[in-house]
C-alpha cells in the first residue's frame, strides 16, 4: 500500500491511497462469501451459488462496494500512520478505481489537527496569590459544616424567608387556560434555589402556611416550549407547609461528629485549620497555573477546525448530563426548569469548548517545542495517585482505560503547566486586585 498527503486550504488536505491488486482480489473473494449467503437463484440452495454463476447473473461489479467496505478501514488507518497526519473528523472518501485484478485507488479529504503558532510562554508575569488562611475563612467553613447537620423544622409561626423550604400546590394559567406541566401538588421548593421561572420564588417570601396567592411571571423569550416563550402566566399557589434549617451549636460532641480525630472544639478547629491551609496553598498555586496557561494560550495563534469544537461540545454535553443525573435530574427535566433546549445549551457552551480545544493544542505544542515527555516512572506515579484517589487498584485502572496513552498525555500536559509556572515571574497583586479579592 502507498499513501501520499497533499495539504490544501486551511486545515484540510487530500490523502491519496493505493491498495495492491492482490488485496483487492482477496477482498472481492471475502465479499462474495458474505453476499452469496443472501442470494436466491432458482436451482441452487441459499448460500450455495457457484461464483461463476453469481458473476454471470449479477456481474463481479456487484461485489465491489462490499470489497471497498472491507478494504477501507485498514487502508485508511495504515495511510494515516504512514503519513503521520492527525485527523480530527471523519474523512470524505472518493473511490477512483475499484476493479478485479487492479489496484484500489481512493482519495480521502481529511480535516487535520491545526498547527499552532506559539507566542510568548516563558517568563510570563503571574500575579502571586495569597495562600494564608484567615479567621473569617475558618469560621465560614465551620458554619458550612454545621449547616450539613441542620435539621429541617416545621415553622409553626412566621412567614416564608430566603433559605426556607416550602411545600406548595400550584396551578399555572396562560391566557386563562391551563398548560401542560404547569400543575403540581405537595411540591417542595427551596426559596432562593433559582429552580423556578425568574420572579416566582421571590413572590412567596412573606407568605404564611395556608396562604394562597396568584403569582404572576413571564416565561423567558428563549423558553424551550415555544408556545410559552415570552408569555405572561399566572400561578395559583397554596402554601401547605414551611420548613427552616435548625443549625446546631458547635460543642465537643458535634466537633467529634464532624471530625472523629478531634475530641473537643479546639482540636476540631486546629485540624480544620491545617486542612484548609493546605487546600488554600494548593488552590493558590492552581490559580497561578491557570493564569500562566491563559496567558500562554492567549499569546498563541491557531485556526481551530469546527469539527474539533463540535467534538469538544459533545464531550461537554456528556459531562453536563452526568452532573445533572448525579443531582437527581435528567436533561429533559433540566430543560423544562431552565427554559433552554439542547441547541441553546450547546451555543452557550461553544466559547468554552473552543477555549478548551485551543488550550489543549497550545499546551501540546509547547510540549513538542520543549521536548517534554512522560516517562514510565511518571506514568506509574500518576496511576498510583489515581489508585489512591478513587480507591481502585492500578491493574483495574489499566483494564478500564485499556491503554495508558490517556494517562501519558495528561502527565505530559501537567509537566508543561509546571514548566510554565517555574519559568514565570511572580509579582505582587496591585492594590485594585487586593481590594477586589477582599470584596469577594
UniProtKB/Swiss-Prot annotation:
One of its GO terms (molecular function) is ribosome binding. Residues 163-248 form the PPIase FKBP-type domain. Coiled coil: none annotated. Its EC number is 5.2.1.8. One of its GO terms (cellular component) is cytoplasm. It catalyses: [protein]-peptidylproline (omega=180) = [protein]-peptidylproline (omega=0). Keywords: Cell cycle, Cell division, Chaperone, Cytoplasm, Isomerase, Rotamase. This is Trigger factor. It comes from Staphylococcus carnosus (strain TM300). The gene is tig.
